[in-house]
Design a protein with these regions (language model features):
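Extracytoplasmic/secreted envelope proteins and their assembly/folding machinery
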Residues: 36-39, 85-93, 132, 154-161
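Surface-exposed amphipathic alpha-helical segments
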Residues: 42, 141-174
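A general boundary/transition motif marking the beginning of the first structured unit of a protein
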Residues: 30, 79-84, 148, 152
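N-terminal "mature-domain start" segment
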Residues: 18-51
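Preference for bulky hydrophobic residues occupying beta-strand positions
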Residues: 36, 120-122, 146
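Conserved polar/disulfide-associated segments of primarily extracytoplasmic proteins
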Residues: 48-142
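N-terminal Sec-dependent export signals
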Residues: 1-24, 174
Length: 174
């Protein structure tokens, strides 16, 4: 999925929001990772690697959204190295570049709720997409990842880029 890095018009933004709001949604996340709206039918998912991140799936176990965040301490970054979204994006790219299952990896710049974000776009040899948005608010770096098929990804991008915030009003606890 190629992401345009040019700024979109307000008309584009309102039509994107209209598309996501026409589907019934629920708010998921927590105070540490932030919150996003997702389709109501999506369910909580627990990864076998035991990650602390918040994860939801459409029920397939293939299409999954993951919310996480990192402080300098959690990312194990020494005090003499600048810790920010760019650092974490580069660290993730290096981690993935030697993975033999990766077919293609590219990067882009985008926005998440008005915040500058790095986007790591990976297409696995299997055809599965793994897209991660990396952005910073204050001292914390947030990541939102989507893994799954191209069609679901296309519909999911507005949920990530338009609805993320630290406001958990109405969030579900399932």
């Amino acid at each position: 999925v190629e992401k345009q890095t040019s700024s979109s018009s307000s008309k584009d933004t309102s039509s994107t929001k209209k598309n996501t709001s026409s589907q019934e949604t629920k708010r998921i996340g927590n105070a540490d990772y932030g919150y996003i709206d997702i389709p109501s039918k999506w369910i909580k998912f627990t990864d076998i690697d035991g990650t602390e991140a918040v994860q939801y799936t459409d029920g397939s176990g293939y299409n999954i959204v993951t919310l996480n965040s990192f402080t300098r301490e959690k990312a194990k970054v020494p005090a003499d190295i600048e810790f920010n979204a760019e650092f974490l994006a580069k660290k993730l790219a290096v981690m993935w570049q030697d993975n033999q299952d990766v077919g293609k990896m590219t990067g882009a710049r985008t926005k998440v709720s008005g915040l500058d974000a790095y986007q790591l776009q990976i297409v696995m040899k299997s055809g599965q997409y793994l897209i991660t948005w990396i952005f910073q608010k204050g001292e914390k770096v947030y990541t939102i990842s989507f893994e799954g098929d191209a069609e679901t990804l296309k519909t999911f991008i507005p949920y990530i880029e338009d609805t993320w915030s630290l406001d958990g009003t109405g969030a579900v606890t399932d």
